[in-house]
């Protein structure tokens, strides 16, 4: 057997209210960059399904920028570490790692010749540094600020200039190399959030939380204009700006939920207004080629349409909290993913477009979800089970409230029956209401219902599998199976009804004969940490497993010694795996991404 990565369904940018989101543009015009968790996400601007993820930061990444040559990317993280790495090779070999600041890096700017960088953020000793790209040697001092620097930029034409904007309400001007402080621009009255030179180097725009934008001369740093409206250029703070490639226009985005295009003299040309609550505040922007991008607090990436300002040309959604569960609808071919923040998305696997389920849903982490006919059954840490119609996907008014926190959910296909295990009971729901509750002396961890709906397997903290018969809504315990050395973490019945597989905290994976309830296959202990999820192929022969060790394995029941390992499928751990079709596996994990893999026998 062999495997190949098919598609990456990327996470959305990590966001924090009141902090700008920095997007990095590709000098060749093909890709754009952002960060989520410890990862840097590289996405094709025209086809977002073409993506790559760089995982090598030890701390959450905060910003990434392409070198103008296009051959390297510089990325920074919360610890003040800067990594410069190769973009031309799939492995992204590291050029250099430098501890530049003692606190978070907020922004990075390259010189036009790709030889120098300015790195800014927070720290105890300094708020910024100007360095050579290949050695980290200093090429000047970024001084003159009394508080953390939020943004910086490098003039793309000679003579080189550097500008920084900080929380001390001022933008500082530097000339070099070596770069030295020249003067400060002090007309902002609140934090600066973004400073950007126009591509031709003639002008600079500075924006801040005072709702103002000032235009400075690109050679001297002297004020030459301002965005029309003064303190009312936007109704709330401006978080980001980005110039058009021809330097004649500039895009700004604001917490007032609008994006605006201005000419190079500050005259307003176009307004893009968004509706919604706080989550619709716009925090990031990028103008690359003919594509204008804006990012909101929710992490959604909008492609703005200048010809139709009322409707974005495209909206990219994803998770920016770890993905906890997956479910697949074989009828519609839609994939459903639930995350730690209670969000459930419906994915079109062909286009890569995700749509959130409408309405008010779970308020906390989605523990598990499964498709039953034309509805999605999900359980959450919020102590509810929800039955969500899928045509169209719309949350019902309320879910079924449970007495304690649900651990797992399973459904009887073809019947209106769902089984949920809580911390101390096994609950059968019918018609979306609790029909019976069976108190147990053990602590359940996982549940599955057999293909014919007659049997329920409950895995437990006592390292056992408790087998129940299911008649109507009544459960009767039939057997207790032992053999596992750790508590149960995953169970699944084979589609042909002849077997079931189980996995535990201690990495063991067993295949059981359903009729005799004897172990048929054992010895699958190749994972290095707890197995979190397992699923059967429709052929009832191959099993896929995911683990906290970050790996995905595919096993063969007919040839137990035969397996393939997808190493580091999701950095940090795999939370969910399933089969999309007989040759495609989907996986999700702590990196907030979903990936599909082609499996060849």
Swiss-Prot record:
GO terms for cellular component: cortical actin cytoskeleton. It holds the Pfam family WD40. WD repeats lie at residues 56-95, 100-143, 145-184, 187-226, 233-272, 318-357, 435-478, 483-522, 526-565, 569-600. The keyword Repeat applies. CDD domains: WD40. Keywords: Repeat, WD repeat. It comes from the Eukaryota. One of its GO terms (biological process) is actin filament depolymerization. One of its GO terms (molecular function) is actin filament binding. Associated with the process of cyst formation. PANTHER family: WD REPEAT-CONTAINING PROTEIN 1, WD-REPEATCONTAINING PROTEIN WDR1. Belongs to the WD repeat AIP1 family. This is 66 kDa stress protein.
